[in-house]
């Protein structure tokens, strides 16, 4: 049985012996071929078996399931099988919201009430290398007016929801899970600990580390050995779909369910606008009783973003899932839509754009994971050497995506979507300056530059809707990207969590010029008859109520260009292409409780 191992078989624990037998039965004898006798490299061999046990324990169904899934998917890939064969696409049902109207406000209010029964899950396994940034992505500043990093912004948003949803109810603590990877785990923990968890109780936060999966060297799904080390299987990330199996195996979902929670919200690591959209989307989930609610944005036909689509199979099965943009057009053409993916009379595709933020109802989610063990339908993307598809240029692996969770759901599941305007909900930071500068004009840059400018734009438009006179933006080319530069307006989530909250804090005749900066750092800051031409920062503790009025006029903060190649500047500034020269500002700080008036 263990012939290729020879006497090395005796080095193994009973658990390892079982695993090795299973591997040998599944065509993996090459792993142990030509091993030296016991006494040579024993420590390396033991480390190898420990690695195999880890790979086995961290995959639903173990390594044998991984190998069998790989054989099936690799055979489909070689044969050119289309996963959508037999499926007909149609437009799913969902809710389209318009910021600030009565319907939107109603959903926002419902979502805030519901937040006390929610848990949040951040998928944060990535580093910022693709952005030209050497750290973890969640440590990047979302904007540089205040320097607030993404993780701080997310935590402060959850805390603001926690507080708002507790009004009139008992105090609650909203749980927050962060999925990390080997690359990000230690640094994420350091970021939290060195900043006192940004105001959260450490017990509210759980880090779940994702393991990698084995690489595959050929169509027979033989596990690939590390070219530099015969006692190590080569591994690569499995994708963010692992979040489901991690939540399942950790037991945390049952804890939440027993504590009376009802919703799990999943989000990704660098979208500075996301929490503006969450209250209303959660309100849609609770009002419509969706088991799965995908947040979406209007999508232009053929735009490079997946479309949310209902797929109905000839055998009667149906599902509502994300279909990647390069698959959606051919699928539509093959299904009686001769023009494929085209814009409707609204000017947008009827298939909304998936932004990878999901709201799941906890009860049905637990039931589904009990059936699947948290496994998500996978795919494989081998790079073949030639058209024969018999060998790979380099090893491949199976991958899975968080948003493919609905693929296994029964037809009775209520799967919907909520469409929000892009300016309000979606500004991811994922492209470096060079790549963003190559994006065709009119398409989104999705860079640190555009991500920061999108925050100022959204805040400006929200204040405008609340009655502020906000000057029009100017167009400027920064890091090779033409962006709208609005007044640099920022506020803490607890100040303006919802539109109705913003409206309650702004009154009279208020205005701000395009070159201005306004940073609101406090909960009870009320703005009345204020005009800003320059820079104004108001910082107040929670129990300080501050009324701000009058006319602020100073030289302000100048926006100065930074060349992304200029190594004398910090990376966080180089990747966005600008910095603020803080020439002059009015800064008011209130560190004691009480009522205060600031008249400029």
Curated annotation (Swiss-Prot):
Optimum temperature is 45 degrees Celsius. It is an enzyme of class 2 (transferase). One of its GO terms (biological process) is UDP-N-acetylglucosamine biosynthetic process. GO terms for molecular function: UDP-N-acetylglucosamine diphosphorylase activity; UTP-monosaccharide-1-phosphate uridylyltransferase activity. Its cofactor is Mg(2+); Mn(2+). SUPFAM superfamilies: Nucleotide-diphospho-sugar transferases. Inhibited by a high concentration of pyrophosphate. Optimum pH is 6.5-7.5. Inactive at or below pH 5.0. Pfam families: UDPGP. The N-terminus is blocked. Keywords: Nucleotidyltransferase, Transferase. InterPro entries: Nucleotide-diphossugar_trans (IPR029044), UDP-sugar_pyrophosphorylase (IPR039741), UDPGP_fam (IPR002618). It comes from the Eukaryota. It catalyses: a monosaccharide 1-phosphate + UTP + H(+) = a UDP-monosaccharide + diphosphate. Its EC number is 2.7.7.64. Belongs to the USP family. May function as the terminal enzyme of the myo-inositol oxidation (MIO) pathway. May also play a role in the salvage pathway for synthesis of nucleotide sugars. This is UDP-sugar pyrophospharylase. It comes from Pisum sativum.
């Amino acid at each position: 049985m263990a012939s290729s191992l020879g006497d090395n078989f005796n080095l193994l624990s009973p658990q390892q012996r079982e695993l090795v037998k299973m591997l040998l039965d599944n065509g993996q004898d090459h792993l142990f071929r030509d091993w030296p006798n016991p006494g040579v490299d024993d420590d390396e061999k033991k480390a190898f078996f420990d690695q195999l046990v880890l790979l086995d324990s961290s995959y639903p169904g173990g390594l044998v399931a991984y190998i069998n899934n790989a054989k099936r998917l690799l055979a489909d890939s070689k044969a050119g099988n289309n996963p959508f064969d037999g499926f007909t696409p149609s437009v799913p049902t969902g809710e389209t919201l318009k910021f600030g109207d009565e319907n939107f406000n109603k959903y926002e209010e419902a979502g805030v009430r519901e937040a006390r029964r929610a848990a949040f899950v951040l998928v944060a396994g990535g580093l910022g290398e693709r952005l030209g940034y050497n750290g973890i992505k969640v440590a990047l500043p979302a904007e540089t007016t205040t320097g607030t990093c993404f993780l701080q912004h997310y935590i402060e948003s959850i805390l603001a929801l926690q507080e708002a949803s507790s009004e009139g109810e008992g105090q609650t603590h909203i749980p927050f899970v962060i999925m990390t990877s080997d690359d990000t785990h230690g640094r994420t923990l350091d970021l939290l600990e060195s900043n006192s968890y940004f105001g959260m109780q450490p017990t509210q936060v759980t880090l779940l580390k994702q393991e990698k999966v084995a690489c595959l060297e050929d169509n027979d799904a033989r596990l690939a050995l590390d070219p530099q080390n015969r006692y190590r299987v080569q591994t690569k990330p499995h994708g963010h779909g692992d979040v489901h199996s991690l939540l399942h195996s950790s037991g945390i979902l049952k804890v939440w369910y027993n504590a009376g929670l009802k919703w799990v919200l999943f989000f990704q690591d660098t979208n500075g606008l996301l929490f503006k959209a969450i209250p209303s989307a959660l309100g849609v989930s609770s009002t419509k009783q969706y088991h799965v609610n995908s947040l979406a944005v209007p999508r232009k036909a053929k735009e490079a973003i997946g479309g949310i689509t209902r797929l109905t199979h000839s055998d009667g099965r149906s599902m509502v899932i994300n279909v990647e943009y390069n698959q959606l057009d051919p699928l539509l053409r093959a299904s009686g839509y001769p023009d494929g993916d085209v814009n409707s009379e609204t000017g947008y595709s009827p298939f909304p754009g998936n932004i990878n933020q999901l709201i799941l109802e906890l009860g049905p989610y637990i039931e589904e994971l009990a059936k699947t063990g948290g496994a998500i339908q996978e795919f494989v993307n081998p790079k073949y050497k030639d058209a024969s598809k018999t060998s790979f240029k380099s090893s491949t692996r199976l991958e899975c995506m968080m948003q493919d969770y609905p693929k296994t759901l029964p037809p009775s599941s209520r799967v919907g979507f909520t469409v929000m305007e892009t300016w309000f909900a979606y500004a991811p930071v994922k492209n470096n300056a060079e790549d963003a500068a190559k994006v065709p004009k009119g398409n989104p840059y999705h860079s640190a530059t555009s991500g920061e400018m999108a925050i100022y734009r959204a805040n400006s438009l929200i204040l405008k809707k609340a009655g502020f006179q906000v000057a029009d933006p100017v167009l400027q080319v920064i890091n090779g990207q033409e962006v709208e530069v609005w007044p640099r307006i920022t506020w803490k989530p607890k100040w303006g969590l919802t539109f109705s909250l913003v409206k309650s804090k702004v009154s009279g005749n208020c205005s701000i010029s395009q070159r201005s900066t306004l940073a609101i750092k406090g909960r009870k800051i009320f703005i009345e008859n204020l005009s800003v031409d320059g820079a104004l920062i108001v910082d107040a503790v929670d129990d300080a109520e501050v009324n701000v009025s009058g006319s602020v006029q100073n030289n302000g903060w100048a926006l100065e260009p930074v060349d992304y190649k200029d190594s004398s500047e910090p990376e966080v500034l180089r990747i966005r292409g600008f910095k603020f020269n803080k020439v002059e500002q009015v800064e008011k700080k209130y560190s004691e409780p009480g009522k205060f008036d600031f008249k400029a």
